[in-house]
């Protein structure tokens, strides 16, 4: 039997420069599923994304998804893409196993937790204050470097890593420290700054966009305090859930988030082509 991809629409060109196309997955000409491919809106035309891959229930467990995924890689190679990315829901075990078997590498996970019960209280001696205008520039530069290096360590070329970082800052901090949907805080312990927090406050969720403990202050529980601060600020804003992204291999952060009740919602993987 032959598994192929059959286009069901012309190649689409979005106003943002993203190309996309939907395909039927066919076995000997018989439709058994569907797939949608696109270029990446942030990394540009050299990076592709699986938007969707679906195989009909009766045709699963026969290798259709594997062949369709490999055929999709050939399609985007023809578009000039050099990397492909996919996001998999936490409970889609079959899809995660398939991606891993095909050589996709886990870059990061999205974690989240519901906000229930009493608002967290910071430990004695710890207080929070807004990031000042004078502190904003150095904080932004340090965060830019940190995030870009995380991306580079996870397979993103340098130019793309910095471009994505800058795009995120422009989108989420359009007015700098005064951006309406951002809360930028400094954590102090006994009057000394020990860390910073960038919390996004959006209609549907709160999101920890950056959290950093000063290197010389690590190992003293300030990271946990910063996360409690994030929960307290989110609850104060009326949010019912809080999320974050953690890069694969950041074991201390993973352990901290797990101990605080965060659970995986999705996995983000990539593969060089």
Q: What residue spans do the PLM features occupy?
A:
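C-terminal "cap" of GNAT-fold acetyltransferases
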Residues: 23, 28, 105, 109-138, ...
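Conserved beta-strand in the GNAT
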Residues: 24, 30-39, 47-49, 54, ...
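Active-site rim helix/loop that mediates acceptor-substrate recognition in acyltransferases
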Residues: 2-31, 36, 158-184, 188
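A short beta-loop-alpha structural element at the N-terminal edge
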Residues: 4-13, 127-154
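Conserved active-site alpha-helix within GNAT-family acetyltransferase domains
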Residues: 66, 90-108, 224, 248-266
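Conserved acetyl-CoA pyrophosphate-binding loop and the N-cap/start of the following alpha-helix
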Residues: 59, 63-71, 217, 221-229
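A short, internal acetyl-CoA/4′-phosphopantetheine-binding micro-motif in the GNAT/acyltransferase core
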Residues: 50-62, 88-90, 211-218
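Conserved GNAT acetyl-CoA-binding A-motif
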Residues: 76-89, 234-245
